[in-house]
Amino acid sequence: MKIFSVTDPEFKPYGRVVTGLDTTKAEILAALANTPLPAATDYVAEDAALQELPAAVEVSEHLFGGMPCQLGWCNGHNTYLNCLEYHRDSEFNLGTEDFVLLLARQEEIAGGKLDTATVKAFRVPAGTLVEVYATTLHYAPCHVDAAKGFRVLVALPKGTNTAKPAIKNDGGDDPQLWACNKWLLAHPDSAEAKAGAYVGLVGENVHI
């Protein structure tokens, strides 16, 4: 699978590289370096050590326009797609090491299904802050170097990925709602599908 860079023009429909905020990025990277590095993949929606940084205020004000936000992380080792998710808002990522994002576009969903042949891979250099647009489907990062794994900031509006509301399926993308502000399409081979997530990915479970 070809791996593009987030600096390539192919990334433009999916997100952007955020420039500036050098002090903010340095604070976050220093704190991220002290977070766990599991053998598999782990996600924490809001990490107290990150949330208490002065950088958290900067993220809220500069990246979310003053909206309350949460700073968490996704760390570990991974080489598979497994699922794709989207939110109603952008997500911001920043890694201590190079990592790869597997991405698709919401408009590529047809009849509640997405063909994984449409997925593209983008390498994010260490220390590069990226915005992943709300219309971009994404999931856990993939590592570039198995010896280093990945430690990646996940900044989102506050409450995202917490417990979902108790709603009945009333059409639209309701069946895909897996958590608060999180709509998920799982591959049938994934652990999420076995746990009851909506199976919306068809084709190969992309592996890099």
Located regions from the model:
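Histidine-centered metal-chelating micro-motifs
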Residues: 128-130, 135-139
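Active-site region of the double-stranded beta-helix
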Residues: 1-126, 140-208
